[in-house]
């Protein structure tokens, strides 16, 4: 997490919230605009987060999501007041990460419904960078997993109006009822896939990044990095990527 700061543009202000000071980013990066806070006996972590929301921060960093209240802070900071949020967690798999964060939100009393809590979690998880340390003491990135929320589609129809018989109308009604109960009881909220994996000492691209995340990444890059990333995407995925500003310029022509 500390090393990732090098790759964040210096124009982006960093806002750090920890339960105990561990990152020491202001000492490592003395030229960066960094505000670090931790809770005390008289000032809660939630109060720290509320103050940080008003300090014009670009990146929120939550040191370690190890307790239920900290999970709530992470969700809040990822949804408002920053471009993106970084945090650490000890989940072994991506589904375990989603489940752990969802359960933390429920135990903290932020949500009462499992499905609603899980929807909020997957809406803020873009990438999971999973590090491992083997028995030789080597530490490396085992995988980078992308989370893709599944958008709910309206699949209900009014075909029953076209039916002439009561039996036909009931059949169409039961089709809609089946769709409703399937969405209510067993709807898939997200998909996940590894975009990069570590195999035999090398990193291998396994799946393309989703179009939405590619565009969001380009929108937050400077011109030089954006051009390099476009070449990378074209070379490895065969995708012609564009920023929102590219589309505006094209329409202006």
Model-inferred region functions:
Residues 1-2:
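Post-Walker A alpha-helix
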Residues 20-21, 41, 66, 133-135, ...:
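A broadly conserved detector of short glycine/acidic/proline-rich loop/turn motifs that flank catalytic sites
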Residues 8, 29, 136, 187-188:
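A generic structural signal for short, solvent-exposed coil/turn residues
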Residues 142-253:
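NTP-binding/hydrolysis catalytic cores, primarily Walker-type P-loop NTPases
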Residues 119-152:
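Phosphate-binding/switch region of NTP-binding enzymes
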Residues 5-122:
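Switch/coupling sub-region of P-loop NTPases
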Residues 66-79, 84-100, 137, 217-252:
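Amphipathic, soluble alpha/beta structural segments
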Residues 22-27, 114-118, 127-132, 173-185, ...:
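Intrinsically disordered, low-complexity boundary segments flanking structured domains
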């Amino acid at each position: 997490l500390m090393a990732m700061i090098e790759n964040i543009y210096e124009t982006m202000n960093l806002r750090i919230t920890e339960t105990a000071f561990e990152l020491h980013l202001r000492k490592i990066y003395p030229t960066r605009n960094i505000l670090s806070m931790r809770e005390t006996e008289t000032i809660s972590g939630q109060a720290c987060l509320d103050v940080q929301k008003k300090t014009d921060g670009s990146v929120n960093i939550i040191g370690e999501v190890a307790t239920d209240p900290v999970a709530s802070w992470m969700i809040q900071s990822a949804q408002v007041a920053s471009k993106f949020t970084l945090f650490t967690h000890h989940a072994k798999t991506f589904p375990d990460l989603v489940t752990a964060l969802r359960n933390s939100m429920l135990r903290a009393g932020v949500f009462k419904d499992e499905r609603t809590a899980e929807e909020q979690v997957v809406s803020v998880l873009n990438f999971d960078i999973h590090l491992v340390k083997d028995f030789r003491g080597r530490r490396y990135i085992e995988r980078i997993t992308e989370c893709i929320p599944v958008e709910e589609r309206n699949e209900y129809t009014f075909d029953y109006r076209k039916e002439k018989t009561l039996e036909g109308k009931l059949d169409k009604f039961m089709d809609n009822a089946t769709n409703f109960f399937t969405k209510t009881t067993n709807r898939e909220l997200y998909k996940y896939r590894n975009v990069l994996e570590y195999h035999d000492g090398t990193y291998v691209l396994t799946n393309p990044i989703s179009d939405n995340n590619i565009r969001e990444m380009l929108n937050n890059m400077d011109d030089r990095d954006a051009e390099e990333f476009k070449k990378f995407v074209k070379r490895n995925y065969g995708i012609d990527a564009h920023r929102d500003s590219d589309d505006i310029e094209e329409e202006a022509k």
